Amino acid sequence: AKEEYDLNVEIIEFTDYVTPNAALADGSLDANAYQHEPYMQAMVNDRGYDFAIAGYTFVYPIGAYSEKYDSIDELPDGAQIALPNDPSNEGRALILMHNEGLITLNDPTFLEATPIDIAENPRNFRFREIEAAQLPRVLPDVDMAFINNTFAQPAGLSLDDALIKEGPES
């Protein structure tokens, strides 16, 4: 960044999704680059932040991982599914389940869907809403967990190993 744009950039890592926006709002950060637009908009609406999009990077697809099963067809009725508990990533996971035919959502375009928005759950999946950074840690205790790359990659998980995953257009 220094050579190409004459910018001094300091990279600061956070372990959750809320703190970077709070730091941006209180002036501790000048910019952040970690969230997709629906999540940013949810935070603006929920917390009254005055943010603007300065540019776009990319968002890694979210994947569903299991240490117990090799395919979604093996998931038993009543399987315990861990979802990220932030507004848009939880919606992304549920939309992916809807698109795979595992559940039916009332509105499959609603990016902030939660389990309350499930119209049909024919396999009686049980959902646990977990803080995203904790999802790799709970993976051994659930049947399947939706984990985005921010936390999957450091935990040694590869999107290639996901039972289901978003496409590159996500």
Task: Explain the meaning of each model-derived region.
Residues 1, 16, 20, 39, ...:
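Stable alpha-helical elements in mature extracytoplasmic
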Residues 1-8, 23:
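Short, polar/charged alpha-helical segment
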Residues 11-22, 109-137:
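Short helix-initiation/N-cap motifs at beta->coil->alpha
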Residues 17-48, 70:
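Pocket-flanking alpha-helical
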Residues 25-35, 79, 102, 123-126, ...:
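Alpha-to-beta junction loops
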Residues 36-37, 149-151:
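Short secondary-structure boundary segments
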Residues 42-54, 69, 146, 154-166:
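Ligand-binding "clamshell"
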Residues 54-103:
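A conserved helix-loop-strand patch within extracytoplasmic ligand-binding domains
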